[in-house]
Protein backbone atom coordinates (compact mmCIF):
# COMPACT_ATOMS: atom_id res chain seq x y z
CA UNK A 1 0.00 0.00 0.00
CA UNK A 2 1.33 3.43 -0.92
CA UNK A 3 2.11 5.89 1.84
CA UNK A 4 0.46 9.31 1.97
CA UNK A 5 0.74 11.51 5.03
CA UNK A 6 -1.11 14.68 4.00
CA UNK A 7 -4.01 15.59 1.75
CA UNK A 8 -6.68 18.24 1.26
CA UNK A 9 -10.37 17.32 1.23
CA UNK A 10 -13.70 19.09 0.76
CA UNK A 11 -16.61 18.24 3.04
CA UNK A 12 -20.23 19.40 2.93
CA UNK A 13 -23.01 18.55 5.32
CA UNK A 14 -26.54 18.00 4.09
CA UNK A 15 -29.23 20.67 3.77
CA UNK A 16 -32.26 20.36 5.99
CA UNK A 17 -35.55 19.33 4.40
CA UNK A 18 -38.28 21.94 4.00
CA UNK A 19 -41.41 21.94 6.12
CA UNK A 20 -44.72 21.02 4.47
CA UNK A 21 -47.77 23.20 3.88
CA UNK A 22 -50.68 20.82 4.22
CA UNK A 23 -54.21 20.75 5.64
CA UNK A 24 -56.21 17.92 7.04
CA UNK A 25 -58.69 16.63 4.50
CA UNK A 26 -61.13 14.16 5.97
CA UNK A 27 -64.75 13.33 5.35
CA UNK A 28 -67.23 15.17 7.55
CA UNK A 29 -64.46 17.41 8.97
CA UNK A 30 -64.89 20.84 7.42
CA UNK A 31 -62.08 22.66 9.16
CA UNK A 32 -59.33 20.10 9.59
CA UNK A 33 -56.61 22.67 10.17
CA UNK A 34 -52.92 22.50 9.23
CA UNK A 35 -51.07 19.20 9.44
CA UNK A 36 -47.79 19.86 7.59
CA UNK A 37 -44.84 17.95 9.06
CA UNK A 38 -41.30 19.16 9.63
CA UNK A 39 -38.40 18.54 7.28
CA UNK A 40 -35.62 16.16 8.28
CA UNK A 41 -32.23 17.50 9.34
CA UNK A 42 -29.29 17.21 7.01
CA UNK A 43 -26.57 14.64 7.54
CA UNK A 44 -23.32 15.45 9.37
CA UNK A 45 -19.76 14.81 8.24
CA UNK A 46 -17.69 13.05 10.91
CA UNK A 47 -14.08 11.97 11.07
CA UNK A 48 -12.84 9.12 13.30
CA UNK A 49 -9.39 7.82 14.21
CA UNK A 50 -9.23 4.05 13.88
CA UNK A 51 -6.56 1.43 14.43
CA UNK A 52 -5.19 -0.63 11.58
CA UNK A 53 -4.48 2.29 9.23
CA UNK A 54 -1.14 4.00 8.67
CA UNK A 55 -1.71 6.03 5.51
CA UNK A 56 -4.15 8.58 4.05
CA UNK A 57 -3.99 7.03 0.58
CA UNK A 58 -7.79 6.52 0.58
CA UNK A 59 -8.17 10.29 0.23
CA UNK A 60 -5.73 10.60 -2.66
CA UNK A 61 -8.31 9.79 -5.33
CA UNK A 62 -11.51 10.98 -3.67
CA UNK A 63 -11.39 14.42 -2.07
CA UNK A 64 -15.07 15.45 -2.03
CA UNK A 65 -17.48 14.14 0.60
CA UNK A 66 -21.11 15.21 0.91
CA UNK A 67 -23.66 14.11 3.49
CA UNK A 68 -27.29 13.36 2.65
CA UNK A 69 -30.04 15.98 2.42
CA UNK A 70 -32.98 15.85 4.80
CA UNK A 71 -36.32 14.74 3.35
CA UNK A 72 -39.14 17.30 3.11
CA UNK A 73 -42.03 17.11 5.52
CA UNK A 74 -45.39 15.75 4.39
CA UNK A 75 -49.04 15.99 5.25
CA UNK A 76 -50.74 14.23 8.15
CA UNK A 77 -47.98 15.49 10.43
CA UNK A 78 -45.35 13.27 8.86
CA UNK A 79 -41.80 14.46 9.44
CA UNK A 80 -39.08 13.97 6.85
CA UNK A 81 -36.24 11.50 7.42
CA UNK A 82 -32.82 12.82 8.36
CA UNK A 83 -30.05 12.77 5.77
CA UNK A 84 -27.35 10.11 5.95
CA UNK A 85 -24.16 11.00 7.80
CA UNK A 86 -20.71 10.58 6.27
CA UNK A 87 -17.95 9.00 8.38
CA UNK A 88 -14.33 9.43 7.32
CA UNK A 89 -11.90 6.95 8.87
CA UNK A 90 -8.30 8.04 9.32
CA UNK A 91 -5.23 6.60 11.07
CA UNK A 92 -4.57 7.36 14.71
CA UNK A 93 -2.28 10.40 14.84
CA UNK A 94 -4.06 12.37 12.12
CA UNK A 95 -4.30 16.12 12.56
CA UNK A 96 -7.11 18.18 11.04
CA UNK A 97 -6.12 21.68 9.95
CA UNK A 98 -7.95 24.59 8.38
CA UNK A 99 -7.41 25.51 4.74
CA UNK A 100 -4.47 27.75 5.65
CA UNK A 101 -2.63 24.54 6.66
CA UNK A 102 -1.55 26.14 9.93
CA UNK A 103 -4.58 26.44 12.23
CA UNK A 104 -5.10 23.17 14.07
CA UNK A 105 -8.72 22.05 14.42
CA UNK A 106 -8.13 18.73 16.16
CA UNK A 107 -5.43 16.16 16.85
CA UNK A 108 -6.89 12.65 16.68
CA UNK A 109 -4.18 10.90 18.67
CA UNK A 110 -6.33 8.21 20.31
CA UNK A 111 -8.25 5.37 18.69
CA UNK A 112 -11.98 6.06 18.72
CA UNK A 113 -11.70 9.86 18.81
CA UNK A 114 -14.32 11.52 16.62
CA UNK A 115 -14.85 15.04 15.35
CA UNK A 116 -17.80 16.58 13.55
CA UNK A 117 -16.34 18.49 10.65
CA UNK A 118 -19.63 19.86 9.31
CA UNK A 119 -23.05 19.96 10.99
CA UNK A 120 -26.13 19.26 8.91
CA UNK A 121 -28.77 21.97 8.49
CA UNK A 122 -31.92 21.84 10.60
CA UNK A 123 -35.16 20.83 8.96
CA UNK A 124 -37.79 23.50 8.39
CA UNK A 125 -41.01 23.66 10.41
CA UNK A 126 -44.24 22.63 8.77
CA UNK A 127 -47.30 24.90 8.88
CA UNK A 128 -48.60 22.92 11.85
CA UNK A 129 -46.14 24.88 14.02
CA UNK A 130 -47.56 28.25 12.97
CA UNK A 131 -51.19 27.65 13.90
CA UNK A 132 -52.46 30.18 16.43
CA UNK A 133 -55.60 31.94 17.63
CA UNK A 134 -55.16 34.67 15.03
CA UNK A 135 -54.05 32.55 12.09
CA UNK A 136 -55.62 29.12 12.32
CA UNK A 137 -54.82 28.13 8.74
CA UNK A 138 -51.24 29.25 7.99
CA UNK A 139 -50.25 28.73 4.38
CA UNK A 140 -46.52 28.92 4.85
CA UNK A 141 -43.71 26.78 6.27
CA UNK A 142 -39.98 27.14 6.88
CA UNK A 143 -37.42 25.97 4.34
CA UNK A 144 -34.61 23.77 5.59
CA UNK A 145 -31.33 25.34 6.64
CA UNK A 146 -28.29 25.02 4.42
CA UNK A 147 -25.48 22.70 5.41
CA UNK A 148 -21.89 23.72 6.07
CA UNK A 149 -19.02 23.35 3.64
CA UNK A 150 -15.29 23.69 4.10
CA UNK A 151 -11.88 22.56 2.90
CA UNK A 152 -9.56 20.96 5.45
CA UNK A 153 -6.09 19.47 5.44
CA UNK A 154 -5.40 16.06 6.94
CA UNK A 155 -1.85 15.54 8.15
CA UNK A 156 -0.68 12.24 9.58
CA UNK A 157 1.92 12.07 12.32
CA UNK A 158 2.55 8.44 13.08
CA UNK A 159 2.30 7.27 16.68
CA UNK A 160 5.73 5.83 17.52
CA UNK A 161 7.42 5.48 20.91
CA UNK A 162 10.94 5.62 19.48
CA UNK A 163 12.20 7.31 16.32
CA UNK A 164 15.26 6.42 14.23
CA UNK A 165 17.18 9.34 12.74
CA UNK A 166 20.42 9.56 10.82
CA UNK A 167 22.02 10.31 7.48
CA UNK A 168 21.04 8.30 4.40
CA UNK A 169 22.71 4.87 4.39
CA UNK A 170 23.31 4.95 8.15
CA UNK A 171 21.73 1.50 8.44
CA UNK A 172 18.38 2.55 9.92
CA UNK A 173 16.29 0.14 7.85
CA UNK A 174 18.66 -2.75 8.61
CA UNK A 175 18.42 -1.92 12.30
CA UNK A 176 14.61 -1.79 12.09
CA UNK A 177 14.56 -5.21 10.43
CA UNK A 178 16.88 -6.62 13.11
CA UNK A 179 14.82 -5.19 15.96
CA UNK A 180 11.31 -5.90 14.68
CA UNK A 181 9.37 -8.08 12.27
CA UNK A 182 9.17 -5.21 9.78
CA UNK A 183 10.73 -5.83 6.38
CA UNK A 184 11.66 -2.47 4.87
CA UNK A 185 13.52 -2.18 1.59
CA UNK A 186 17.27 -2.44 2.21
CA UNK A 187 19.94 -1.57 -0.36
CA UNK A 188 23.44 -0.13 -0.47
CA UNK A 189 22.59 3.33 -1.77
CA UNK A 190 21.30 6.58 -0.20
CA UNK A 191 17.56 7.27 0.12
CA UNK A 192 16.54 3.62 -0.10
CA UNK A 193 13.81 4.54 2.37
CA UNK A 194 11.44 7.07 0.81
CA UNK A 195 8.57 6.80 3.31
CA UNK A 196 8.42 6.07 7.06
CA UNK A 197 8.35 2.46 8.23
CA UNK A 198 6.95 1.19 11.52
CA UNK A 199 7.84 -1.91 13.50
CA UNK A 200 6.88 -3.31 16.90
CA UNK A 201 9.74 -4.25 19.24
CA UNK A 202 8.93 -7.21 21.51
CA UNK A 203 11.46 -7.41 24.33
CA UNK A 204 9.14 -9.70 26.33
CA UNK A 205 5.45 -10.45 26.64
CA UNK A 206 4.94 -7.25 28.65
CA UNK A 207 7.68 -5.07 27.14
CA UNK A 208 6.90 -3.73 23.70
CA UNK A 209 7.03 -0.43 21.88
CA UNK A 210 6.69 0.99 18.37
CA UNK A 211 9.83 1.94 16.45
CA UNK A 212 9.70 4.33 13.47
CA UNK A 213 12.30 4.55 10.70
CA UNK A 214 12.10 7.77 8.70
CA UNK A 215 13.94 8.67 5.47
CA UNK A 216 17.47 9.94 5.97
CA UNK A 217 18.30 13.61 6.42
CA UNK A 218 21.07 15.49 4.68
CA UNK A 219 22.61 18.90 5.22
CA UNK A 220 20.16 21.57 4.11
CA UNK A 221 17.11 19.33 4.57
CA UNK A 222 15.38 22.12 6.50
CA UNK A 223 15.64 24.20 3.31
CA UNK A 224 14.28 21.43 1.09
CA UNK A 225 17.42 19.51 0.18
CA UNK A 226 17.02 15.77 -0.36
CA UNK A 227 13.63 14.69 0.93
CA UNK A 228 13.46 17.73 3.22
CA UNK A 229 12.31 17.54 6.84
CA UNK A 230 8.70 16.70 6.03
CA UNK A 231 8.94 13.23 7.54
CA UNK A 232 10.36 14.48 10.84
CA UNK A 233 6.77 15.07 11.93
CA UNK A 234 6.43 11.31 12.32
CA UNK A 235 8.87 11.27 15.25
CA UNK A 236 7.49 14.36 16.99
CA UNK A 237 5.41 12.15 19.30
CA UNK A 238 8.32 9.84 20.14
CA UNK A 239 9.61 9.59 23.69
CA UNK A 240 13.22 9.19 22.56
CA UNK A 241 15.28 9.39 19.37
CA UNK A 242 17.86 6.77 18.43
CA UNK A 243 20.52 8.57 16.42
CA UNK A 244 22.43 6.09 14.25
CA UNK A 245 25.83 7.11 12.91
CA UNK A 246 27.56 5.02 10.25
CA UNK A 247 30.85 3.83 11.74
CA UNK A 248 32.35 3.10 8.32
CA UNK A 249 32.27 6.69 7.07
CA UNK A 250 35.21 9.06 7.33
CA UNK A 251 33.58 12.12 8.92
CA UNK A 252 31.97 10.78 12.10
CA UNK A 253 31.78 14.19 13.77
CA UNK A 254 30.26 15.83 10.71
CA UNK A 255 27.55 13.18 10.48
CA UNK A 256 26.39 13.84 14.04
CA UNK A 257 26.60 17.63 13.63
CA UNK A 258 24.54 17.58 10.43
CA UNK A 259 21.62 15.69 11.98
CA UNK A 260 21.62 17.80 15.14
CA UNK A 261 21.56 20.96 13.05
CA UNK A 262 18.56 19.75 11.04
CA UNK A 263 16.66 18.75 14.19
CA UNK A 264 17.20 22.21 15.66
CA UNK A 265 16.18 23.89 12.40
CA UNK A 266 12.95 21.86 12.30
CA UNK A 267 11.84 23.17 15.72
CA UNK A 268 8.81 21.87 17.65
CA UNK A 269 11.20 20.89 20.49
CA UNK A 270 12.44 17.94 18.46
CA UNK A 271 16.04 18.76 19.30
CA UNK A 272 15.19 18.70 23.02
CA UNK A 273 14.04 15.08 23.01
CA UNK A 274 16.07 12.41 24.77
CA UNK A 275 18.70 11.06 22.41
CA UNK A 276 20.46 7.71 22.43
CA UNK A 277 23.56 7.87 20.28
CA UNK A 278 24.66 4.67 18.57
CA UNK A 279 27.61 3.87 16.33
CA UNK A 280 26.24 1.45 13.75
CA UNK A 281 27.94 -1.09 11.45
CA UNK A 282 30.70 -1.80 13.98
CA UNK A 283 30.91 -5.37 12.69
CA UNK A 284 32.93 -3.97 9.78
CA UNK A 285 35.61 -2.46 12.05
CA UNK A 286 38.53 -3.93 13.98
CA UNK A 287 38.69 -3.32 17.78
CA UNK A 288 41.18 -0.45 17.54
CA UNK A 289 39.17 1.40 14.90
CA UNK A 290 36.01 0.93 16.97
CA UNK A 291 37.60 2.65 19.95
CA UNK A 292 38.93 5.50 17.83
CA UNK A 293 35.59 6.11 16.11
CA UNK A 294 33.66 5.94 19.39
CA UNK A 295 36.07 8.39 21.03
CA UNK A 296 35.74 10.81 18.12
CA UNK A 297 31.94 10.69 18.29
CA UNK A 298 31.89 11.14 22.06
CA UNK A 299 34.23 14.11 21.81
CA UNK A 300 31.93 16.05 19.48
CA UNK A 301 28.60 15.03 21.03
CA UNK A 302 29.41 14.74 24.72
CA UNK A 303 27.47 11.46 24.74
CA UNK A 304 29.03 8.03 25.08
CA UNK A 305 27.81 6.12 22.02
CA UNK A 306 26.57 2.56 22.10
CA UNK A 307 28.18 0.14 19.64
CA UNK A 308 25.67 -1.78 17.53
CA UNK A 309 25.36 -3.71 14.31
CA UNK A 310 22.06 -4.35 12.57
CA UNK A 311 23.71 -7.09 10.49
CA UNK A 312 25.30 -9.18 13.26
CA UNK A 313 22.85 -8.15 15.99
CA UNK A 314 25.63 -6.95 18.27
CA UNK A 315 24.40 -4.45 20.86
CA UNK A 316 20.88 -4.32 19.42
CA UNK A 317 19.11 -5.69 22.51
CA UNK A 318 21.03 -3.40 24.86
CA UNK A 319 20.14 -0.38 22.72
CA UNK A 320 16.47 -1.35 22.60
CA UNK A 321 16.33 -1.79 26.38
CA UNK A 322 17.89 1.64 26.88
CA UNK A 323 15.23 3.10 24.59
CA UNK A 324 12.46 1.22 26.40
CA UNK A 325 13.57 2.77 29.70
CA UNK A 326 12.89 6.22 28.23
CA UNK A 327 9.56 5.03 26.84
CA UNK A 328 8.45 3.84 30.28
CA UNK A 329 9.39 7.18 31.80
CA UNK A 330 7.32 8.90 29.11
CA UNK A 331 4.39 6.62 29.92
CA UNK A 332 4.33 7.92 33.48
CA UNK A 333 6.69 5.64 35.35
CA UNK A 334 9.46 7.17 37.42
CA UNK A 335 13.08 6.56 36.46
CA UNK A 336 13.52 4.54 39.64
CA UNK A 337 10.63 2.22 38.79
CA UNK A 338 11.93 1.67 35.28
CA UNK A 339 15.43 0.91 36.55
CA UNK A 340 14.19 -1.51 39.22
CA UNK A 341 12.04 -3.44 36.77
CA UNK A 342 14.89 -3.78 34.29
CA UNK A 343 17.49 -4.82 36.88
CA UNK A 344 18.22 -8.57 36.77
CA UNK A 345 17.00 -10.57 39.72
CA UNK A 346 19.73 -11.83 42.04
CA UNK A 347 19.82 -15.58 42.44
CA UNK A 348 19.76 -17.02 45.93
CA UNK A 349 23.17 -18.60 46.76
CA UNK A 350 22.98 -22.34 46.76
CA UNK A 351 19.78 -22.45 44.74
CA UNK A 352 16.21 -22.06 45.83
CA UNK A 353 15.48 -21.97 49.57
CA UNK A 354 12.02 -22.46 51.11
Curated annotation (Swiss-Prot):
It comes from Caulobacter sp. (strain K31). Monomer. This is GTPase Obg. It is found in: Cytoplasm. Residues 339-348 have a biased composition (Acidic residues). Its cofactor is Mg(2+). Its main location: cytoplasm. Residues 160-328 form the OBG-type G domain. Residues 333-354 are annotated as: Disordered. NCBIfam families: Obg_CgtA (TIGR02729), PRK12297.1 (NF008955), PRK12299.1 (NF008956). An essential GTPase which binds GTP, GDP and possibly (p)ppGpp with moderate affinity, with high nucleotide exchange rates and a fairly low GTP hydrolysis rate. Plays a role in control of the cell cycle, stress response, ribosome biogenesis and in those bacteria that undergo differentiation, in morphogenesis control. GO terms for molecular function: GTP binding; GTPase activity; magnesium ion binding. The gene is obg.
Amino acid sequence: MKFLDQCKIYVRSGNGGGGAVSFRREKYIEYGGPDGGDGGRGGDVWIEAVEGLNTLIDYRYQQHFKAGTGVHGMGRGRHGAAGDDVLLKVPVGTQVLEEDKETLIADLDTAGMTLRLAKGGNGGWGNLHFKGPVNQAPKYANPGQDGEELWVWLRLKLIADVGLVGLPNAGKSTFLAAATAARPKIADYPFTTLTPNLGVVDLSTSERFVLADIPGLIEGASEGAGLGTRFLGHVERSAVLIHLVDATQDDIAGAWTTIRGELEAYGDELADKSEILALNKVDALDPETRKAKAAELQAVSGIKPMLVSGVSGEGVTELLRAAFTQVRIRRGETPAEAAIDEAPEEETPGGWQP
